[in-house]
Amino acid sequence: MIATPSQTGPLILGGTGRLGRALRKLAQDGHWPEGRAALWHGRRGDYAWDMREPAPPLHERPEGVVVLAGVTSGSPEELAANADLARAALRLAARDDLGPVLLMSSAAVYGRAEGPCRETEASPANAYGMAKLDMERAVAEEVDRLGAEAPRACCLRLANVAGCDQLFDAMAARQVTLDRFTEGHGPRRAYVGPLSLARVVSALLSAPELPPVLNLAQPGAVPMEALLEAAGARWHWRPAPETALPETLLDTAQLAAIAGPVATATAPGLVAEARLAGWRLA
């Protein structure tokens, strides 16, 4: 598909990955109007582009760029592609005078930090978190290099997305073993539902000013056992190892100041949003 003159949505790079598929279903089902008007990238998508190569022409002007494209696992060399993909997106935006550019980073940049984690902090504890922090730095360097031609760019430190993370994958496969800490609870994590994510992205695309880095989560930390119960999943406990992380919590004050109030995360709400975006319990 070639964008039409009525194209008013963003260009979404990496639209065929897990998160992209969830957001596209929301768009196709009418839950995310801006996504329905978007130009969806993929090697065989609306906008076909191998991001390792120069970007082909855009026939219409999209309203901003959302970069979902990324590498989540592999060797440090493979994970370094996250920075390369970010640079490619920024160069396309600079070439065609597009913006803002929203790039998906990760709460993994906070590692084992105790929350609420703020955007001024970063202490990655694994290769993926380090790769995402390197990507953020690469974005800042590329913006400086591009100078006056640089687009506005914001790296979003994304929480777990309901329906797209390891817990929901394990639920779908009916293979869930949950760590239980000595206090009797399981891990608590920062989450965002896919519909809430889509709405926040739309708000950020229209924001007049954006910081270089921004946390993206619904307020609060959700007990994983509550998610399992809300989904009707089968699971069992195991004693939490010493290396297990009890809680990840993101500070969302800056997000609320820019995008407006975001509903506090609840297990039933997250499961409902995951199902709306196509997730199913096997």
Residue ranges and their predicted role:
Residues M1-T4, A265-A282:
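Amphipathic terminal alpha-helices
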Residues I2-W32:
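N-terminal Rossmann NAD(P)H-binding glycine-rich loop of SDR-like oxidoreductase domains
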Residues L13, L79-A83, P124-E136, A190-Y191, ...:
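Short-chain dehydrogenase/reductase
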Residues D46-A88:
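NAD(P)H-binding glycine-rich loop region in Rossmannoid oxidoreductase-like domains
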Residues A88-A127:
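Conserved Rossmann-fold NAD(P)-dependent oxidoreductase catalytic core, especially the SDR/UDP-sugar
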Residues E142-A190:
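NAD(P)-dependent short-chain dehydrogenase/reductase
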Residues A172-F181, R188-L214:
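Alpha-helical substrate-binding/gating segment
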